[in-house]
From Swiss-Prot:
Functional note: Together with the chaperonin GroEL, plays an essential role in assisting protein folding. The GroEL-GroES system forms a nano-cage that allows encapsulation of the non-native substrate proteins and provides a physical environment optimized to promote and accelerate protein folding. GroES binds to the apical surface of the GroEL ring, thereby capping the opening of the GroEL channel.
CDD domains, per the entry: cpn10 (cd00320)
Gene3D superfamilies found in the cross-reference section: GroES chaperonin (2.30.33.40)
UniProt protein name: Co-chaperonin GroES
Main localization (coarse): cytoplasm
Cellular-component GO terms for this entry: cytoplasm
Designated gene of the protein: groES
SMART domains: Cpn10 (SM00883)
Record's keyword terms, sorted: Chaperone, Cytoplasm
Family: Belongs to the GroES chaperonin family.
Gene Ontology molecular function: ATP binding; metal ion binding; protein folding chaperone; protein-folding chaperone binding; unfolded protein binding
Originating species: Blochmanniella floridana
Superkingdom as given in the UniProt entry: Bacteria
SUPFAM superfamilies: GroES-like
Chaperone found in the keyword field: yes
Length: 97
């Protein structure tokens, strides 16, 4: 199944980020107390402005992004992958390569 986000929405595949506690315990996801990373799989055509114009999105397909855990709406198994749909406003940063 193919999915195409509308307007300023973005389809994201979550990437787990590991970190270690001071005791050497590996923490993942929300237990790490950090933002979550993900890969952008698809983007909408842009945000509709009050004057009817379209503002293109800053994120692109393939970008690695950082967002707070809990943002986005889970969509179960699109092409056997769990993905999130979120607004570009929910994205905190793009990870530069």
């Amino acid at each position: 199944m193919k999915i195409r986000p509308l307007h300023d929405r973005v389809i994201v595949k979550r990437k787990e980020v590991e970190s270690k506690s001071s005791g050497g315990i590996v923490l993942t996801g929300s237990a790490a107390g950090k933002s979550t990373r993900g890969e952008v799989l698809a983007v909408g055509h842009g945000r509709v402005l009050e004057n009817g114009g379209i503002k293109a999105l800053d994120v692109r397909v393939g970008d690695t992004i950082i967002f707070n855990d809990g943002y986005g709406v889970k969509v179960e198994k699109i092409d056997n992958e769990e993905v999130l749909i979120m607004s570009e406003n929910d994205i905190l940063a793009i990870v530069e390569k």
